């Protein structure tokens, strides 16, 4: 078994264990002396001891019995800490973790310090050393949020030109659906006044002209991001892989998802796998536009090859609710810059027939498909087209997934239940953008975002996720938002939609394993399953729910 030690702060814990020999050298390890929470069953179950043999759990039960059967095993005293199944994020973009870990940190507080455009510019300037620029050839940063910036607007190329006119610059919006590029970058990308808006995207313009102002939306932005942010050398590639994996492991991940893999991100992960660089399991969902070729390779498989596999297809039907590109049936109360009154957002794929064809291909080939849909109009389109395909092919044994569903209506949850759809919801929004949602869609609907309790009560299978690098891949904050639903201003966003801490943990362990067809090997602590474990400094079921966000991952074992 390989042990991945995340923080130097845990050295004290390790050296205080009862045995003097490092368990790194032992095949059998007996864990005891803490809360060992199996996550097996509808109510919490604890065991006194757990024994692993290399990468497999071989015993869960009483400490007396464990010591008798496994007398030669090295013992690991947990000293009151909490041992759980390794975390499985139901939706994230692992290929973007390195950029988040390495790039300029332009997230707003509490995650970083970009609370106005001046501070954003300073952070970018401070980051712009020759060594950093050399990694990709660009100055780049991840996570600016116009809804939190004092100016309540997007930065433009004019703002970024204050950082540099010599080097190209790209900053990624916190939603991952927009970017801003400086003048040098626009020229390198050949985006100018004659460049048309792509279908499903928008190049924002300087008012009363066709000149790009630097802001790119949706399909004007998303295809170019991985090209710009890709490492430019073998040394840079190695630095990216180390940074991305260390970030995931530091938050307790043992399985991570690349939730919309383009060819470049698939090649990045394929290279990592083939060079035996991956330490945790990575499952990719390939963008529908290139799925037909990549899902016919050996990487599309039920089991991992060097910790990597393709799990299915990703379809995106609209954009970002906080960025106001999610496709709605009711107008936004505050349209984005340049939009007219009555603005509804817009579809990524306007034609129902085109969407139906994508679903039909997935069903015909027995490919799992994950569908990004945030606005209720996008979910109407999803339901309309899926109904037709399901009538033709059936859905027995399928585990197709709604990703985000931020503005889902109750009647749509009923429809998803009938279509056997798993709902992977995104309650991080309640903290990061709960106040903003209420501004742009109103109090009544704003309190219904990420309706986890309603979905669960209606009998849907649910999971929750980080969507990192949209936010940091901090699964303790995901648990905290799912159980508290408190906004930045301290307001409760939909009290009746709260999950219990145990339900929230289920969403990132057993239920997420089920979503990925991996429930036979992951998600609970049972004999025969993988020894994917995470050690926490406190038990999420025993602390006050407001303190869940402060729990620290001490160790991730894969």
Model regions: which residues?
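His/Asp/Glu-enriched, well-ordered alpha-helical/loop segment
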Residues: 360-370, 377-400, 404-405, 410-418, ...
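C-terminal motif of bacterial Sec signal peptides marking the signal peptidase cleavage site
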Residues: 15-16
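Short, conserved catalytic or interaction motifs in soluble domains
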Residues: 19, 62, 538
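Acidic (Asp/Glu)-rich catalytic clusters
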Residues: 273-276, 299-308, 393-395, 416-418
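Divalent metal-binding segments
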Residues: 22-32, 37, 41-296, 302, ...
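Sec-dependent N-terminal signal peptides
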Residues: 4-12
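Non-cysteine beta-strand/loop elements that form the S-adenosyl-L-methionine
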Residues: 93, 307-325, 420-431
């Amino acid at each position: 078994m390989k042990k991945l030690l995340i923080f130097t702060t845990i050295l004290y814990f390790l050296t205080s264990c009862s045995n003097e020999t490092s368990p790194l050298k032992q095949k059998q390890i007996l864990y005891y002396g803490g809360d060992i929470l199996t996550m097996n069953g509808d109510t919490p179950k604890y065991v006194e001891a757990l024994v692993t043999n290399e990468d497999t759990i071989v015993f869960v039960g009483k400490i007396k019995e464990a010591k008798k059967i496994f007398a030669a095993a090295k013992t690991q005293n947990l000293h009151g800490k909490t041992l759980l199944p390794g975390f499985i994020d139901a939706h994230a973009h692992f290929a973007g973790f390195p950029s988040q870990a390495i790039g300029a940190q332009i997230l707003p507080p509490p995650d970083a310090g970009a609370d106005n455009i001046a501070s954003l510019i300073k952070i970018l300037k401070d980051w712009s050393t020759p060594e950093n620029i050399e990694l990709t050839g660009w100055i780049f940063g991840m996570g600016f949020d116009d809804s939190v910036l004092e100016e309540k607007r997007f930065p433009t190329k004019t703002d970024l030109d204050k950082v540099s006119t010599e080097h190209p610059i790209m900053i990624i919006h916190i939603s991952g659906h927009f970017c801003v590029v400086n003048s040098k970058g626009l020229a390198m990308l050949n985006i100018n006044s004659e460049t048309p808006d792509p279908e499903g995207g928008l190049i924002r313009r300087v008012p009363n002209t066709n000149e790009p102002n630097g802001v790119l939306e949706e399909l004007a932005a998303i295809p170019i991001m991985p090209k710009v942010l890709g490492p430019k050398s073998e040394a840079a590639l190695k630095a990216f892989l180390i940074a991305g994996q260390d970030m995931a492991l530091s938050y307790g991940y043992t399985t991570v998802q690349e939730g919309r893999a383009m060819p470049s991100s698939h090649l990045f992960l394929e290279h990592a796998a083939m060079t035996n660089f991956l330490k945790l399991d990575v499952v990719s969902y390939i963008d529908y536009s290139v799925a037909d070729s990549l899902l016919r390779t050996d990487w599309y498989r039920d089991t991992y090859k060097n910790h990597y596999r393709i799990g299915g297809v990703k379809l995106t039907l609209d954009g970002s609710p906080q960025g106001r590109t999610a496709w709605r049936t009711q107008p936004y109360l505050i349209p984005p810059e340049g939009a007219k009154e009555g603005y509804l957002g817009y579809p990524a794929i306007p034609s129902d027939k085109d969407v139906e064809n994508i679903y039909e291909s997935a069903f015909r080939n027995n490919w799992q498909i994950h569908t990004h849909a945030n606005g209720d109009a996008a979910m109407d389109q999803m339901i309309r087209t899926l109904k037709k395909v399901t009538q033709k092919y059936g859905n027995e044994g399928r585990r197709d997934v709604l990703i985000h569903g931020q503005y889902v209506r109750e009647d749509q949850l009923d429809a998803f239940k009938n279509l056997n759809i798993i709902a992977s919801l995104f309650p991080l929004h309640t903290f990061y953008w709960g106040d903003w949602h209420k501004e742009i869609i109103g109090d009544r609907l704003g309190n219904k975002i990420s309706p986890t309790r309603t979905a669960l009560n209606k009998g849907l299978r649910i999971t929750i996720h980080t969507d990192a690098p949209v936010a940091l891949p901090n699964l303790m904050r995901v648990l905290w938002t799912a159980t508290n639903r408190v906004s930045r201003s301290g307001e409760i966003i939909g009290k009746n939609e709260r999950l219990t801490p145990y339900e929230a943990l289920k969403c990132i362990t057993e239920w997420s394993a089920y979503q990925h067809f991996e429930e036979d090997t992951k998600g609970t602590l049972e004999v025969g399953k993988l020894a994917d474990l995470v050690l926490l400094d406190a038990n999420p079921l025993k602390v006050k729910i407001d303190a869940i966000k402060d729990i620290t991952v001490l160790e991730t074992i894969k």
